[in-house]
Amino acid sequence: MPGNHDIPYTFPARFTRPWAEFERHWGTTQPLHAGDGVVVVGLNSVRPWRHQSGKVTSQQLAAVTEHFHRAPPHALRVAVLHHHMLGAPWRSKKKPVKDRNAVLASLVASGAQLVLAGHIHQSTIAERREFEIATPGGERAVIVSIAPALGRPRPNRHGETRGLHVYDAAENELTVRTYMWREDGWGLIAVRRFPLGVEPLAFEQRERAGTAS
């Protein structure tokens, strides 16, 4: 997927041929992969006139819906874009993709189960219901994952490191393993498990004070 550093800095190429070099290497800015048990739809969120901010159009979201609706019922549905849907609290100045709430709501409605992004160079993973108010039909699990940067950390950027996520999808569960680069190789630093599919919200039943046992 193209990021904001994958387009020319020079004028007029930035506006007249922004994707030429990227497409020369990768063929398209909005890839689609339909494999055995998984459908991955890429969304180009980069806008040449804004270096940092990202945007997804209604036409792009409609295409995601079409691809997911054509996918087999059992397939894991994954949407990928560069700009993040949520950010680490310590990177609060990095704004998420424009109209984040509407974009995420559209992806959820289309059937997305996993939404992947990057941009902020730091790892964050959450289940959608952790930061959005539950609505009718909101019992379906959707995981939002922001991948760490794979390349060398930028100078004078504290808290950044090389890292990657590995996703392992089972029938009712998604396992996310986070690896960080150490001097002697990759080290596993976290394993997180999230529900897949429809799972009603669970509330703990607490005994009232003074209730006889």
Regions found by a protein language model. Name each.
Residues 73-76, 112, 173:
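A general structural motif
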Residues 4-6, 45-46, 83-84, 118-120, ...:
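Active-site metal-binding loops of divalent metal-dependent hydrolases
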Residues 1-66, 71, 105-108, 132-133, ...:
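Extended active-site neighborhood of metal-dependent phosphoesterases/phosphodiesterases
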Residues 37-47, 78-82, 142-149:
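Active-site-proximal beta-strand elements of phosphoester/diester hydrolases
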Residues 72-88:
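Short acidic, glycine-rich surface-loop motifs adjacent to enzyme active sites
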Residues 11-13, 51-56, 90-95, 155-158:
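Short, solvent-exposed loop/turn segments at secondary-structure boundaries
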Residues 93-170:
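Conserved beta-sheet core of the metallophosphoesterase superfamily
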Residues 168-213:
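A short C-terminal boundary segment appended to hydrolase-like catalytic domains
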